[in-house]
């Protein structure tokens, strides 16, 4: 936790809040020379979740603009190819559709796939009116909703594979409602449209099964015998921070190392407000199962009585008005962070003497604690997977104008004890960041502080990247590059900026990994890589190829075990010293009360 005894906190200068950037929009041009023409009345409208729109509007503020939408590993492969095939949105083969043939020669030379994509125009059939054409265009817009929290990529439907090249911000602003079509007198609809009723019903049923009703998803309703017109309407509720799901590259990353996809989060992202209430009436607290603790409070497990949901409860004592102010800032920050690699906030309750934050329970424990296990075979590819996820989470934070400012191994947790999904936790020291305003802080854990924090200089998003470099160095070697015998020596080592790659421990580490670290642990913050540059670095790419030839066990496991043992000893020493001081104070007070 950021609030552990190893942290240093001297002063805080709060920045002003800033609006989150807007996401880009993407376009998908139509094939040259192809006129889609009116839809065939026998052909069912394409489900909105399987289509893309070439003119989707830009996202509202607060939408996530970072990563490409996901391609899910769930479901059969054929569904991912339905976007451009000749049988798009139809249950029957394209050969059964009426074709327009000018001459026998052109009819023979035309491929079947081209005939199916040409719109199947027939001179003998009446053309569909403008309103119906607009309805079909609206139906091609992508589904704006994700089925769950960004923390749960495993349950993303396979029907969302076609969104892989479309930024998530484009899919967050509109929903689609199926309403009965009203035909104008000048638009005679063929009576044979009713024959496509069964096909349309099956198409709707298939989409309904794969994308259950959620706010912002495509809604199917109306009498199918009269046809359906899809209209784009504003989303019922816009979330701050668009959900992110696994991209194809990241999904491939998990398939390399894990037997199963990452598990889902227990609840969707939500906007939390601090409210007064009785904790014991809603939650069963388990103080015996402690997860952590520090200066500001303790963390334990709990269970929501109404749902049986297991959560982590962070209990903060209200000793001064500033304590509540800090908690409100933490809630505000976490409301922005809708990402699979960032812990999710569930509820916040205030009592007369304390504030309790209920958060997602992460059962895997600290990342470092897991990889030092003797049964765990840590390779450089494992390290790449962990580092890339951390950089993904940092990138989302920075796009939402949030700085963590206390990134360290204790704040990187594994979702479970078998997979490779990790999450960043503890936003108690996080700050809103405006690049146009100066922000200075002088708190954090000395071992992972950047030189600008130690010097109380202006900080930026590159401040978190220094800490990312130190964590990566430790994952690869098991050594802490600036750790001294005490905090003063550690801070002096940070200010000097002198560090090196130990020849023995980095013997099995690739040059790409060393280059990655060398571009993060840089004294001049302007020369450091940002999170986006980290994700584009060669070391964090082409993992499938590297996994085939990189299975050598890193030496960092043994050294990390020694590091963790030393850290535990230091924590126990501080705890015992504090208890002894308290005992002496209590004894002195008792003697004074007796007049001794």
From Swiss-Prot:
Region described as Calmodulin-binding: spans on this chain: 574-586
Catalysed reactions, semicolon-separated: L-seryl-[myosin light chain] + ATP = O-phospho-L-seryl-[myosin light chain] + ADP + H(+); L-threonyl-[myosin light chain] + ATP = O-phospho-L-threonyl-[myosin light chain] + ADP + H(+)
Location in or out of the cell: Cytoplasm
Class in the EC hierarchy, top level: transferase
N-acetylalanine modification, residue list: 2
Bias type Basic and acidic residues, positions: 40-63, 189-209
UniProt keyword annotations, A-Z: Acetylation, ATP-binding, Calmodulin-binding, Cardiomyopathy, Cytoplasm, Disease variant, Kinase, Nucleotide-binding, Phosphoprotein, Serine/threonine-protein kinase, Transferase
Presence of keyword Nucleotide-binding: yes
Record: active site: 406
Listed GO CC annotations: cytoplasm; nucleus; sarcomere; synapse
Main localization category: cytoplasm
EC number: 2.7.11.18
Record PTM Phosphothreonine, positions in chain: 445
Domain Protein kinase: residue ranges: 285-540
GO BP: cardiac muscle contraction; cardiac muscle tissue morphogenesis; neuromuscular synaptic transmission; peptidyl-threonine phosphorylation; positive regulation of gene expression; protein autophosphorylation; regulation of muscle filament sliding; signal transduction
Disease note: Cardiomyopathy, familial hypertrophic: A hereditary heart disorder characterized by ventricular hypertrophy, which is usually asymmetric and often involves the interventricular septum. The symptoms include dyspnea, syncope, collapse, palpitations, and chest pain. They can be readily provoked by exercise. The disorder has inter- and intrafamilial variability ranging from benign to malignant forms with high risk of cardiac failure and sudden cardiac death.
Chain's role: Implicated in the level of global muscle contraction and cardiac function. Phosphorylates a specific serine in the N-terminus of a myosin light chain.
Protein family per UniProt: Belongs to the protein kinase superfamily. CAMK Ser/Thr protein kinase family.
The protein's assembly and partners: May interact with centrin.
Protein name, entry field: Myosin light chain kinase 2, skeletal/cardiac muscle
């Amino acid at each position: 936790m950021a609030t552990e005894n190893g942290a240093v906190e001297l002063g805080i200068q709060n920045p002003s809040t800033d609006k989150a950037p807007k996401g880009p929009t993407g376009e998908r041009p139509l094939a040259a020379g192809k006129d889609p023409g009116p839809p065939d009345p026998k052909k069912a409208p394409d489900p909105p979740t399987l289509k893309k729109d070439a003119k989707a509007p830009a996202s509202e503020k607060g939408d996530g603009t970072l990563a490409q939408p996901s391609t899910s590993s769930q479901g059969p492969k054929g569904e991912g190819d339905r976007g451009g095939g000749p049988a798009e949105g139809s249950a029957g083969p394209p050969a059964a559709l009426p074709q327009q043939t000018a001459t026998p020669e052109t009819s023979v030379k035309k491929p079947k796939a081209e005939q199916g994509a040409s719109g199947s125009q027939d001179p003998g059939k009446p053309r569909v009116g403008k309103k119906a054409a607009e309805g079909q265009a609206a139906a091609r817009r992508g589904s704006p909703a994700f089925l769950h929290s960004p923390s749960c990529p495993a349950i993303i439907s396979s029907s969302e594979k076609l969104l892989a090249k479309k930024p998530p911000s484009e899919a967050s602003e509109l929903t689609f409602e199926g309403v009965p079509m009203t035909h104008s007198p000048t638009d005679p609809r063929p009576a044979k449209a009713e024959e496509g009723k069964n096909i349309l019903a099956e198409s709707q049923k298939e989409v309904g099964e794969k994308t259950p009703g959620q706010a912002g998803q495509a809604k199917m309703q109306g009498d199918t015998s009269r046809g359906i017109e899809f209209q784009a309407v504003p989303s019922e509720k816009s979330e701050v921070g668009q959900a992110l799901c696994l991209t194809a590259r990241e999904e491939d990353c998990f398939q390399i190392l894990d037997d199963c996809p990452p598990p889902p989060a227990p609840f969707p992202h939500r906007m939390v407000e601090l409210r007064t209430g009785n904790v014991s009436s809603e939650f069963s607290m388990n103080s015996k199962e402690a997860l952590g603790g520090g200066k500001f409070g303790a963390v334990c497990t709990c269970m929501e009585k109404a749902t049986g949901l297991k959560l982590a409860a962070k209990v903060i004592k209200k000793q001064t008005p500033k304590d509540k102010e800090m908690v409100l800032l933490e809630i505000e920050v976490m409301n922005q962070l809708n990402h699979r690699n960032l812990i999710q906030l569930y509820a916040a309750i205030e009592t007369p003497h304390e504030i309790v934050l209920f958060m997602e329970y992460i059962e895997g424990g600290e990342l470092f604690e897991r990889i030092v296990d003797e049964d765990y075979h840590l390779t450089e590819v494992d390290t790449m997977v962990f580092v890339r996820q951390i950089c993904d989470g940092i990138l989302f934070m920075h796009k939402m104008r949030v700085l963590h400012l206390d990134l360290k191994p204790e704040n990187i947790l594994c979702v479970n004890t078998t997979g490779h999904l990790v999450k960043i936790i503890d936003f108690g020291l996080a700050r809103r960041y405006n690049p146009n305003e100066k922000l200075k802080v002088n708190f954090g854990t000395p071992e992972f502080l950047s030189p600008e924090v130690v010097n109380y200089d202006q900080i930026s998003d590159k401040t978190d990247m220094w800490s990312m470099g130190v964590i990566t160095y430790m994952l690869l070697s098991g050594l802490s590059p600036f750790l001294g015998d005490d905090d003063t020596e550690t801070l002096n080592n940070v200010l000097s900026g002198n560090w090196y790659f130990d020849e023995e421990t980095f013997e099995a580490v690739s040059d790409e990994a060393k280059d990655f670290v060398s571009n993060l642990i840089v004294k001049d913050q302007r020369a450091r890589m940002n999170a986006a540059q980290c994700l584009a670095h060669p070391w964090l790419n082409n993992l499938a190829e590297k996994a085939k030839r990189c299975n050598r066990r890193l030496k960092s496991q043994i050294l990390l075990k020694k590091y963790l043992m030393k850290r535990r000893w230091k924590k126990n020493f501080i705890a015992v010293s504090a208890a002894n001081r308290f005992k002496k104070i209590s004894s002195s007070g008792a003697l004074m009360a007796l007049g001794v």
